[in-house]
């Protein structure tokens, strides 16, 4: 009996796994729908890596307002270096509530990038959670979408994974973070040559001292255009050096914060390095190669082509919604105008609706002249027409005799006939 019960349970689980076609991650304020939580690509064969899905509102996640705004931070967690970096921020403004979809038909969208990750993009309004153009092995890792609504005090965190396999070196990226000990002082900076001075706080078990250090980052001809900096920093310390540099924040799981998702959920507001990102439109207008060391013109063209989907979606919305609505409004205006015109003709221009003109010969009464001047309308009753007929008899038709009496020959003949009658 127990064996049959186990087989029946396994059959139910297998049928549920076969019938399930999507994954839904439920957050506090919104949720994420996707068909697969991870995707892989082969370097250098594959030209793109795309993860499809969208954000939505489930039951109990309804918005308190008709229009809302929000910010999405795309964060890359590198498995090899065990650190995370904010690579893109997308700001949506004045978004209406369209069914249960999130960030659809927004009035304004502003996208900003960190220049080393210009090939990596997210566009949730077009059902694209992650799009990597020409993926490389260094693009492997976890990509986290941190969604913050303006009216919500906390943020929601959703994650997907990307794996890029290198056929030349026959290496496979680790699906989980490495267990080796990584010093929390390791950060990677990709920036041109500059001098800066920053305050770094060093904490020990007994005392906490503040030291001021001067560092110089020199651009090297390496493939990553990066320089490894080593400073003594406490765990999860946010450090910004210079005006264009963006450090990779080291994260170490602990009993209090076991995962990176809980670490990002515990942070309030926007991440401080968001102000260092460059708007996409300004980045595309930049022609000097010194400002974009790792992005080629082909990458910019690919990114422009990828982000043009938002314009295509907006044009499709205009063609499907605005144009039919305008046609319906025009038809309604035509119908209303016809109704108003008929009412005016019926009630205000009754004299002009129907007139009968007759000759004025013979004696006509005042009632007849009034009837001829302003004839009865189409809506006049039969009784009013009968009253007009009885009050004024019809004018007799003029006979041809009147014309004969006016002839002198006929008058002479009439006189002769009368004389003959008198003589007889």
From Swiss-Prot:
Compartments reported by the entry: Virion membrane; Host cell membrane; Host cell junction; Host Golgi apparatus membrane
Gene3D superfamilies to which the protein is assigned, alphabetical: 2.70.230.10
Membrane disposition: Single-pass membrane protein; Single-pass type I membrane protein
Residue ranges, compositional bias (Polar residues): 379-388
Origin superkingdom: Viruses
Virion surface side: 23-319
Keywords in alphabetical order: Glycoprotein, Host cell junction, Host cell membrane, Host Golgi apparatus, Host membrane, Membrane, Phosphoprotein, Signal, Transmembrane, Transmembrane helix, Viral envelope protein, Virion
One GO location term (cellular component): host cell junction
Signal peptide (UniProt feature, chain positions): 1-22
Function: In epithelial cells, the heterodimer gE/gI is required for the cell-to-cell spread of the virus, by sorting nascent virions to cell junctions. Once the virus reaches the cell junctions, virus particles can spread to adjacent cells extremely rapidly through interactions with cellular receptors that accumulate at these junctions. Implicated in basolateral spread in polarized cells. In neuronal cells, gE/gI is essential for the anterograde spread of the infection throughout the host nervous system.
Family stated for the protein in its record: Belongs to the alphaherpesvirinae glycoprotein I family.
Name the UniProt record assigns to this protein: Envelope glycoprotein I
Species for this entry: Equine herpesvirus 1 (strain Ab4p) (EHV-1)
Gene this protein is translated from: gI
């Amino acid at each position: 009996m127990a064996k049959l019960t186990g087989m029946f349970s396994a059959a139910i689980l297998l049928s549920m796994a076969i019938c399930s076609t999507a994954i839904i991650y439920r957050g506090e304020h919104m949720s994420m729908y996707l068909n697969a939580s991870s995707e892989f690509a082969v370097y250098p064969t594959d030209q793109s890596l795309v993860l499809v899905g969208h954000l939505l509102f489930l039951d109990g996640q309804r918005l308190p307002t008709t229009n809302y705004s929000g910010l999405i931070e795309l964060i890359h967690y590198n498995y090899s270096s065990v650190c995370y970096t904010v690579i893109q921020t997308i700001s949506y403004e004045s978004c209406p509530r369209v069914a249960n979809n999130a960030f659809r038909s927004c009035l304004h969208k502003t996208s900003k990038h960190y220049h080393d990750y210009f090939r990596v993009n997210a566009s949730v309004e077009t059902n694209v959670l992650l799009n990597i153009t020409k993926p490389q092995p260094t693009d492997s890792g976890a990509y986290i979408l941190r969604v913050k609504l303006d009216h919500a005090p906390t943020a929601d965190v959703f994650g997907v994974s990307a794996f890029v396999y290198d056929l030349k070196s026959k290496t496979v990226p680790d699906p989980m973070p490495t267990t080796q000990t990584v010093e929390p002082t390791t950060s990677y900076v990709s920036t041109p040559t500059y001098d800066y001075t920053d305050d770094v706080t060093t904490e020990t078990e007994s005392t906490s001292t503040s030291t001021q250090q001067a560092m110089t980052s020199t651009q090297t001809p390496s493939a990553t255009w990066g320089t490894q900096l080593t400073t003594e920093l406490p765990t999860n310390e946010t450090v910004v050096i210079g005006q264009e540099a963006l450090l990779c924040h080291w994260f170490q799981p602990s009993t209090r914060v076991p995962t990176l998702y809980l670490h990002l959920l515990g942070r309030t507001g926007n991440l401080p390095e968001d102000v260092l990102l460059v708007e996409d439109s300004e980045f595309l207008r930049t022609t000097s190669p010194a400002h974009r060391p790792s992005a080629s013109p082909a990458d910019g063209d690919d990114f422009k082509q990828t982000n043009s989907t938002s314009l295509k979606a907006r044009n499709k919305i205009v063609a499907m919604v605005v144009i039919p609505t305008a046609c319906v409004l025009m038809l309604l205006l035509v119908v209303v105008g016809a109704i108003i015109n008929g009412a005016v003709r019926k009630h205000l221009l009754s004299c002009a609706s129907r007139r009968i003109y007759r000759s004025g010969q013979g004696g006509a009464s005042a009632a007849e002249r009034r009837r001829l001047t302003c004839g009865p309308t189409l809506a006049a009753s039969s009784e009013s027409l009968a009253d007009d007929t009885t009050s004024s008899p019809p004018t007799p038709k003029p006979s041809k005799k009147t014309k004969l009496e006016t002839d002198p020959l006929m008058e002479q003949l009439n006189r002769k006939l009368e004389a003959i009658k008198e003589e007889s």
